[in-house]
Curated annotation (Swiss-Prot):
It comes from Anaeromyxobacter dehalogenans (strain 2CP-C). The gene is rimM. The keyword Transmembrane helix does not apply. HAMAP family: Ribosome_mat_RimM (MF_00014). The keyword Cytoplasm applies. This is Ribosome maturation factor RimM. InterPro entries: PRC_barrel-like_sf, PRC_RimM, RimM, RimM_N, RimM_N_sf. An accessory protein needed during the final step in the assembly of 30S ribosomal subunit, possibly for assembly of the head region. Essential for efficient processing of 16S rRNA. May be needed both before and after RbfA during the maturation of 16S rRNA. It has affinity for free ribosomal 30S subunits but not for 70S ribosomes. Keywords: Chaperone, Cytoplasm, Ribosome biogenesis, rRNA processing. It is found in: Cytoplasm. PANTHER family: RIBOSOME MATURATION FACTOR RIMM. Belongs to the RimM family.
Length: 163
């Protein structure tokens, strides 16, 4: 079973064990089960409730009944079986589908590889490792994910690639 990273637990919400999950692109609203990866441990859990709450998803899972339990999972990756996920939609992407993709400019200059993503509140940010070191590239209109070619193409505004 191939697992895809669909988000990350970024905080506890409320007192009843809801997890604040960033980056799910709506997938959590359709899943019955998820896998949580926290450190080296992976555990599958039933999704009891999932609803949008601002830029996050408030998710309640089996086995987490209070805020303390939810706080213990902050930092955990949320994964789902690839076969249970539909397409993320036009202009939307599952985080796991972006990790590992090469990043190039529209001129063809290689910038590096997507090694991670950050949820910042306003827009998700690609973490790109390359010859220039680590670059942070916001998923803004000047970034195109070319699924057919399996790469990310950036038309960087002035200053984006400066150290």
């Amino acid at each position: 079973m191939a697992l895809v990273r669909i988000g990350k637990v970024v905080r506890a919400l409320g007192l009843k064990g809801h997890l604040g999950v960033a980056g799910s692109e709506g997938a959590l609203g359709t899943l019955e089960r998820v896998v949580l990866r926290h450190g080296a441990a992976e555990v599958e859990r039933k999704v009891l409730e999932a609803r949008p709450q601002g830029r996050l998803w408030a998710v309640r899972i089996d086995g987490v009944a209070d805020r303390t339990g939810a706080e213990a999972l902050v930092g955990a990756e949320v994964l789902a079986p690839r076969e249970e996920l539909g397409e993320a939609g036009e202009g939307r992407h599952y985080w796991g589908d972006l990790e590992g993709l090469p990043v190039v400019t529209v001129q063809g200059e290689a910038l590096g590889t997507v090694t991670g993503l950050m949820e910042t509140g306003a827009v998700d940010v690609l973490v790109v490792q390359g010859a220039r070191g680590e670059l942070l590239v916001p998923l803004a209109p000047y970034v195109e994910v070319d699924r057919a070619a399996g790469r990310v193409v950036v038309d960087p505004p002035e200053g984006l690639l400066e150290p």
